Structures are given as C-alpha cells and as structure tokens.
Amino acid sequence: MKTFQLGFVGMALLAAACGANGADSSSSTGSDEAITDDHVGTALRVTQTNLVSDQPGVAVTTDPNAVNVWGISFNPAGPAWVSNNGTGTTEVITPVGADVLTVTVPVPTYVQADAGVSSTPTGQVFNGSATDFGGDKFIFVTEDGTISGWQPSTGAVLHDDYSSIGAVFKGVGLGPSMIYVADFHNDVIDVFDSTYKQISVAGGFEHPALPKGYAPFNVFVNGTQVFVAYAKQDKEKHDDAKGYGNGYVDLFDTAGNFEARLVSRGVLDSPWGMAIAPASFGKLAGALLVGNTGNGFIHAFTLSEGGYGGTTATYAGYLADTKGKELFIDNLWGLAVSPAPDQNRLYFSAGPESESHGLYGRLDVPGDFDAGQ
C-alpha cells in the first residue's frame, strides 16, 4: 500500500513561495487581473532522485551528453527518450538512469555536416502508429526550426526545415494523425499531417487576445484535449522573458478550436512542462501539473467540465520537497508520467545554471518506488 505525505500550506507559506510580488494562481475564469494569495492548496511532498547529469556527483549516472535536458517521451513498452538541447542528441534512459542508446538529431540543411554544429532539440513525441509519419516511432522538433523522425531502420531523418523563416520550435504534441508544433518566434501553432506536410485546421489555434509579446511555448495533448502554454518573448523572440506572472495556459480541441483560458498569469513563470498527475499523487491525482521554467516550481490545477463556462481550472496546490518547502528545480523543462507498469512515476528534465548543464530525474511520493526495478 502506497503512503502519501500530504500537508496543507498556510497563506504565509504560499506567499513566500510565490515571491515578493505575492502572485498566486489565476481563478478558474482565466482573468488577467492580478491574483492575491487567497488560494491555499495542497503541498504534496515528493522525493527527488537525480538519474542523469553532465556534472559528476550530481546524479546516479554522469553523461557528458546531458546538457540542457529538455523533451521527454515514452514508448509504452520501453524506457524514456530524453532530448539534450545542448548537445543535439536524444538518449534512451532506463528507470534507474542507465543510457542504452544515443541518437543524433539532424541539423538544418544549411549547416554543413563537418561544421561542428549540433542541433537544438526541444520537445518530442512517441508515435504508436505503424503507418503515420512513415512509421517513425519518435518525432523531434528543434529551436533550429526543424522536424525529424526516428525509426530503427533509418535512424533520425530530417523531414521539415523552417529555419529559413526563423522558426523556433519549442514544443510538440501528437494529435490524431497530426502533430502540433509551437513556433515561439513566429507566435503560431503549426500543424503537420501524418506525411509531415503542413496543414490548416478548422480552429487555427486562434485564441482571445494575449498581451503583446506572448507566444506558444509548448503543447501537451491528453486525449482530445490540447493544452497550450504561452510565455513572454524576449527582444529577439527566441527565448522566454522570465518573471512572476509571465504565462498563460489555454485549452483547445484537436481541431484547434479554442475552448477555455485555464490559467492566467498568477503563479506562472514561463510555463513549459505539463502532465496529468498520476494516481500516487493523492489529493493532486488527476490534476494538470504545470512546471515553470522561470522559477523552477510545479503547480497543480484541478480541471472541471460542464456548465455554461465549459472547462475550468482551479488552483489545487504545488509539489514540495521532503521538508515541505516548495520544490525548486533550476531551469525546469519537461514533465512526463511513465507508462504502465510504472505509471505512478513523474519524470522531469532541466537545464541548470542558465542551460549550461543538464539534469534528468524522477519525483516520487515517498515509498512509491522500488530502486531495484
């Protein structure tokens, strides 16, 4: 029987965790108004296990490829695939941190093969179809504006190159025989069919006006729900401008029709990682977890459907360390729940020290993980 260490945090603790501005979650209405600290939620204590890092002594495995570790995806019958933005690679990592395969993600076509330049992978997805995307099992997008696919017989192959228009692909989600790609520079969700051809969808991922300078940062698909996280662009429109309240999360259907603004500003700070909390997460089980790249915190929102307003999100709490303090992971990127039989594991990736290093690890409710697995 799994045990849970759950605690309720007071207003003062939540205010301290949110910083001097006292920013908290938005209400379920998705209002752009400043949020006060009147949403007291559950602090779920988790244990952090660092599995892979490029820095000796930081994790179970030291791997020089693990620099600015970013996207995470799972083959339901196998271990995690984890992208390293800083070295242009993707690695297959077991639950105990062993690296069993390294894949080089292709560079854009304009880069010479001998130029000594690596690609910049960000998000990735697993494709379970035997025919869609030419049978590619894993699909990678990059800040170079490229899309590549991998399968055992060919390795990683470049399929789309939008570097010439300055595309900066920060994230990707898999829909019904299509992928949704967040082009942060051009402020658009690009959609590609199962042949890697760019297409239009009915809704076009049009959304109610955001403040100037916000753009799609990542896409997370859960069944028929498509969640899009928005971050504030820097002056070059290449990277995010971090800061408390800098972020939004919207909900769309698979045809790109806007359904709801779930979270506005509040506790968000360049949100990127998104996942549905596993059953082992007690009172937060089933909640939408949103990880902030800006401040390294992970917040939870309970989703409710029905009624005139459609789907709404209510602030539910956050992840805390074993001492009850809000869990901090420097330059947090990915969040992903592993498939059966280990579906109660939440994995994370990060690029600590301004993306100069990397970290991949696991977050467990105490007593939930057998290290011998």
Regions of interest found by a model, annotated:
Residues 14-17:
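C-terminal motif of bacterial Sec signal peptides marking the signal peptidase cleavage site
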Residues 1-8:
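Bacterial N-terminal signal peptides that target proteins for export
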